[in-house]
Amino acid sequence: MTMSLDEVREILTEMAEGDDFIQVVPEFFCPEVVGHNDVKLGVMCCLVNQWDTPDGRDRINILLKGQPGCGKTIFIDHLRDRWGALYLSGDAKKSSLKGDGRRSDGGIRLFAKYNGGIVAHDEIEEFSDINTLRDIMENGRYVDAIGGKYEEFEAQIRYVAAANDISKVPKPILSRFDLVYHFDMPSVEDSIRIAQYLIAGVKNLETTDEMIYAYISTAMNIDPVIRPRDIDGLDAKVKPFADHFESINEGKSGRWIKSILRIAKALTRLKLKDEVTAVEIEEAIEMKTASDKQLEIPFD
């Protein structure tokens, strides 16, 4: 399905009965999951920010945490089955992911092969070489030794991970996740809705998937502008930060602010707009603030 930006925007606006379709569209993403629209929006933000820029990282790392059987793996499976993500289990081998310089062919180098792609990693707390993820999550590249020489490989992956026990995940890795979502056991009402879904299934699943894929593909190709046109524009975009810092009576690191800006850029793409405004920055701060409550470590 090939659709123009205007066609996609028109259809989505009709679906949402207004311009604010970003609050409605997540319901159609990963329909196998009942509820969790906040998680769906976060994963969609991850999908639309494919590449970093000369200014730094644009890719958004997502962590899904909670006890087994709460729905985390459904997102992982959806990304693998519908979005072509590289699926990794907790026991993935470093030699397969980054390569093996001792081999003449350098090994598999899955991270390099999935440069620009999606990686869905289940049970990351069981990954023995988890610290090797740090440079990839932050910089989108890594260095490996080949024949006694060091070579740099591009690995700008969109990373979505799931963990049952984050106490086993090193803090430097946890601090690289832009958005963290906790999954509780379903409530009585949620369990009833899940039972309804499992019995009735999803209507028009193939058409819905095609529509969402066309939407995400269109959003990915938008390059939103963050820099303001004048001093008034600068003040307007800084105001959400100033209001937030004053409300909590503390400042935040540059890394935290950069995370807000890349989330805001993703939200702008999902709105099919070409300029980040104070509205998207404020929404990104709300998403990030809720996420920060899931981890007791600073994003710095």
Which sequence ranges carry the predicted segments?
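Conserved ASCE/P-loop NTPase catalytic core
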Residues: 4-221, 260
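Basic, amphipathic alpha-helical bundle interface domains used for macromolecular binding and assembly
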Residues: 24, 160, 180, 187-296
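Trafficking entry modules
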Residues: 299-300
